[in-house]
Regions:
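N-terminal Rossmann-like NAD(P)+-binding domain of SDR-like oxidoreductases, especially those catalyzing
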Residues: 1-192, 196, 338, 349-357
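Residue-level signal for the nucleotide or nucleotide-sugar donor/cofactor binding architecture
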Residues: 6, 71, 102, 110, ...
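NAD(P)-dependent short-chain dehydrogenase/reductase
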Residues: 142-147, 151, 160, 168-254, ...
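Conserved C-terminal active-site "lid" loop/helix of NAD(P)H-dependent oxidoreductases
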Residues: 234, 259-260, 297-319, 330, ...
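Non-catalytic, hydrophobic alpha-helical segments
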Residues: 237, 241, 263, 276, ...
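C-terminal "lid/loop" region of Rossmann-like NAD(P)-dependent oxidoreductases
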Residues: 255-262, 271-277, 282-304, 345-351
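Short arginine-rich
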Residues: 333-343
Length: 358
């Protein structure tokens, strides 16, 4: 194992509780942790039809899974008390921006109250460590050409962003109320950019939308073609979460540090939706897919978004590993293998190993 990857050895034989295991990022993280020899405990809703990863990667056979809504505090707390994990990775969320417009109540309950439930159970059961995942959308977006850093103002003028900003405010409240006096950090929050990668089939996400249109030979509709986002492969922020978890478990971070980290791509990966679409279609060798631009927006979305990742580079020695072309190639190669009915457990293991060799 390369020296820069040795932090991953920290997870061997550790009991790791992951929320959101049936989701896109949660499934990738659970699979990776299982590869590392961790004893993974999952809490999540049952997989939706669009959530293909959990079953494709055979996670039901690999991890101890509880099907539960994180809004059910009593049941959630009983599981965390019973399992007493070494570390919790909290990823469960309502993660679709458009869905937050149509169903704000569920979005707010899950992203705010569900997160409070995790923090409270972590506190009263004296769990050792917590990596608490929110989103880059937690920052008050001014639609300016600036990269948001961890000390920038939180906020949101739409339901999704405000739910994520609120989750961060709740985290800050718990940290300062109960954990600020500890010598070493036990919990940290993370804010990642727009993740892409194999296995995501959610609606209103650019890569799944392209894949579905390509396979069905239907026109592709772009909702916000000029919106710029910090695109990164799903393994990039997950490597940051795992590195951060390693530092927490090994008491390498003191509480005088701000307990929040951005994980995003280098600035050259921040491109607009139209640019990403062209790269994906080129990789798919598709030049006859008609693209429609959806006129008139039902809900607000920021035009510009990028993250400042200097803190993660300096304090954690974390770096993005893939450029934009590699990110697209990793993503499309996974989908091609999936639709070609290849052994996706082996393929996904190989892709993680390839990522670690970069």
């Amino acid at each position: 194992m390369k020296s820069k990857n040795k932090y991953l050895l920290s997870y061997k034989r550790k009991k790791v509780l992951v929320t959101g295991t049936t989701g896109f990022k949660g499934a990738w993280l659970s699979f990776w942790l299982d590869m590392l020899g961790a004893k993974v405990v999952g809490i999540a809703l049952k997989p939706e039809k669009s959530s293909i990863l959990f079953n494709t990667l055979e996670l039901g056979k690999k991890i101890k899974q509880y099907y539960l809504n994180i809004n059910e505090y009593k049941k959630l707390n009983l599981i965390i008390k019973k399992e007493k994990p070494d570390i919790i990775f909290h990823l469960a969320a309502q993660s679709i921006v458009s869905e937050s417009f149509y169903d704000p109540l569920t979005t707010m309950k899950t992203n705010i109250i569900g997160s409070v439930n995790i923090l409270e159970s972590f506190r009263i059961n004296n769990i050792a460590n917590l990596v608490y995942i929110t989103s880059d959308k937690c920052y008050l977006n001014l639609d300016k050409s600036q990269s948001y850093k961890e000390t920038d103002r939180l906020g949101g003028v739409d339901n999704y962003s405000s739910s994520k900003a609120s989750a961060e405010l709740v985290f800050s409240s718990y940290f300062h109320s109960y954990f600020k006096k500890d010598k070493y950090l036990r919990l940290a929050s993370t804010r990642a950019g727009n993740v892409i990668g194999g296995g995501d089939m959610k609606i209103n996400r650019i890569i799944p939308d392209i894949i579905k249109s390509f396979r069905k030979k239907k026109n592709l509709t772009l909702r916000n073609p000029n919106a710029t986002r910090p695109w990164q492969h799903v393994l990039e922020p997950l490597s940051g979460y795992l590195l951060l978890g390693h530092n927490l478990m090994n008491k390498k971070l003191k509480t005088n540090l701000l307990p929040s980290w951005n994980f995003g791509p280098n600035i050259v990966n921040c491109k607009n939706v139209k640019h990403i679409t062209k790269l994906v279609l080129d990789r798919l060798k598709s030049d006859n897919l008609k693209i429609n631009i959806k006129k008139g927006k039902r809900f607000h979305e920021a035009k510009l978004l990028s993250l400042n990742i200097l803190k993660a580079k300096k304090e954690l020695n974390w770096r993005p590993r893939l450029n934009l072309e590699q990110t697209i190639n990793f993503t499309i190669d996974w989908y091609k293998s999936y639709f070609d009915k290849k052994d996706m457990v082996s393929f996904t293991k190989d892709q993680i190993k390839l990522f670690l060799n970069n």
